[in-house]
Amino acid sequence: AMACCAWTMPAVAANAAPAAPAPADGPPLVLPNFAALARRNGPAVVNISVTREVAQVGIELPPGIAPDSPLAPYFARRVIGNREEVSLGSGFIVDADGIILTNRHVVGDAATVDVKLTDKRQFKGRVIGSDPLSDVAVIRIDAHGLPAVATGDPARTEVGDWVMAIGSPYGFANTVTQGIVSAKSRSLPGEAYIPFIQTDVPINPGNSGGPLFDLQGRVIAINSTIYSKTGGYQGLSFAIPIDIALDVKDQLLRNGRVTRGRLGVALQELDATLARSFGLASADGAIVTMVAPNGPGARAGLAPGDVVLSVNGRGVADSADLLDTVARIRPGRQAELAVWRAGRALRVTVEVGALDR
């Protein structure tokens, strides 16, 4: 229901002095200059057009028999063919000699990859490699002296920080959008090993693979996915931290594949209530709920009910943080875990295994 609200100015004595302005709590708010950021970083963002061969099934009829003819079901013949499907995405140059990062789902199963720069030059792209777990792919184009982005440290980004995205939503190249970091270390269904950065930056189909910048113009993440009931932007956007993407890039360029470490345990989040029941002062950490037989954790002596507090001296915030930290350790190397068990602190040394995925 609508309500009409009228505000009446209170009577003031004719000679009354004007009220003094309330003191400011701090310096005036200055909004960031997104125009300068976009101007400086736009040339390193690319538009990616991908062609795929998609199988399709059709029905073929002999000449003279219409599809609605009663004879059609008896003479129809199933035929299988291919059709071309074109999709669009974004990417960004990380090396002046033609190395580009994007999402795997942008270039997966591509027959051809066409890359267009902001100066309207176009190149054929070659997919060097991709990683299903992180959804990161590396493309190379035959060009040199290209504008490349600078990269930052996602760990230094805080909730509430301004961020900016550049990409090609629905093919509209070099579209600039902005917002803030809404949350960090988000774990999405089926993506437990990636601690996503959540933002409210408007992201739509075609933005995938584009960069997320901080206010210093450094890329801190790759825009990857949205949560939506409509298929379009609804305020929930998720990006892959750039340090994870760069590690994937380096491994793909060096080895052609990506390896990750694993503990061989199932984990549960630790909340304030559980932390108190365990006798812990903080809810930081991850609870071990299951240990795979003969896995790295089992061989090291980890047990259900253990709370992992740190890895190699680095504190664990939650289960996604623990999985990410261990994934970055090369298989075969040792890691020292700080573990809380039955009210006392332990040190557990584990030889990190290899993640099969």
Where on the chain are the PLM-derived regions?
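Short strand-turn-strand beta-turns centered on an Asx-Gly dipeptide
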Residues: V311-V316
